[in-house]
């Protein structure tokens, strides 16, 4: 399959910058699931070590979030990661094998702030949050939403667990 139309990169970007992420000699980055680039910092979510590395815009390691455990303020397994617009806190979906929760930490010090006990139980390839809504890219992964089986491309969920399925394919 070929693209019908090409868009020159110059139409969507005026420059490109490659930043080499540098870690301390005692650290190793493993399987990076996601790189999140914000105004102040670059975040690398390492799912093999269950750690989030934080880099400055020059690529130097600033700190890392490493609170895997079973105690208060610790996570069992890192799920999706959300960082607020001013980068004052970082939130991690804590996959526990049961009801997922969202742990909130103060950014850079990673002091534990609180836990939200509500996170939709949806299987997805990617999750983003914007203005209180969760956007799940489920891309044909089977889910049961609104009392129906679905494998649509996108599911949107609000803070009261109201769901909307977009591009429902119903592929068997």
Protein language model annotation of sequence segments:
Residues 101-108, 149-161:
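Beta-propeller blade signature
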Residues 44-48, 92-96, 136-139:
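Conserved beta-strand positions in repeat-built beta-propeller and related beta-rich domains
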Residues 16-20, 61-69, 112-119, 163-171:
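Beta-propeller fold detector
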Residues 37-39, 83-86, 129-131:
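Residue-level detector of Asp-centered blade-edge/turn motifs that repeat once per structural unit
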Residues 9-10, 44-66:
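Beta-propeller domains
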Residues 47-48, 95-99, 144-151:
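Short, solvent-exposed loop/turn segments at conserved positions within beta-propeller repeat blades
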């Amino acid at each position: 399959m070929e693209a019908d139309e090409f868009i020159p990169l110059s139409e969507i970007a005026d420059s490109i910058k490659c930043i080499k992420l540098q870690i301390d000699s005692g650290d190793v980055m493993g399987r990076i699931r996601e790189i999140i680039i914000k105004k102040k910092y670059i975040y690398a979510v390492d799912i093999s070590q269950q750690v989030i590395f934080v880099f400055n815009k020059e690529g130097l390691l600033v700190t890392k979030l490493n609170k895997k455990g079973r105690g208060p303020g610790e996570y069992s397994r890192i799920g999706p990661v959300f960082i607020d617009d001013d980068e004052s806190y970082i939130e991690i979906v804590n996959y526990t094998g049961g009801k997922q929760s969202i742990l909130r930490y103060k950014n850079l010090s990673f002091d534990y702030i609180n836990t939200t006990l509500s996170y939709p139980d949806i299987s997805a390839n990617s999750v983003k949050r914007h203005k209180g809504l969760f956007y799940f890219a489920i891309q044909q992964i089977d889910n049961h939403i609104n009392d129906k089986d679905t494998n649509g491309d996108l599911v949107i969920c609000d803070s009261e667990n109201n769901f909307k399925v977009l591009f429902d394919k119903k592929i068997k």
